[in-house]
């Protein structure tokens, strides 16, 4: 487990009361972060082949998928380490590479935004 992954899980537990859910036997490290109240996802931590993000192949990378406003997607994708969402709606989600490219405060801000947007009132 990467340090950033551990930090995100700790942040989600401390700030949102979230316990990660491990839903798939085929990907036992994939952790879903969801609201207790409405069951909606606000984060997905998993490992994927680097080539799924257009990176050089031959390695596995740790990622976080977070929800974002469609108005912010374009500017977020200009940042190094943020990609069109892997396996999610690319209008409402982005994928963040957990390799230290983005500092933890920025990761936590993205997680907070995702938590807020997925509360059931917007962009469902």
Descriptions of predicted regions:
Residues 1-124:
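Charge-dense, helix-prone N-terminal extensions
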């Amino acid at each position: 487990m990467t340090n950033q992954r551990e930090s995100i899980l700790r942040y989600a537990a401390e700030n949102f009361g979230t316990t990660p859910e491990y839903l798939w036997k085929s990907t036992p490290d994939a952790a879903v972060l969801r609201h207790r109240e409405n069951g909606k996802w606000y984060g997905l931590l998993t490992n994927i082949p680097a080539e799924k993000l257009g990176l050089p192949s031959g390695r596995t990378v740790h990622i976080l998928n977070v929800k974002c406003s469609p108005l912010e997607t374009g500017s977020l994708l200009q940042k190094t380490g943020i990609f069109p969402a892997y396996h999610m709606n690319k209008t409402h989600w982005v994928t963040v590479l957990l390799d230290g490219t983005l500092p933890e405060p920025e990761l936590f801000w993205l997680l907070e935004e995702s938590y807020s947007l997925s509360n059931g009132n917007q962009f469902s």
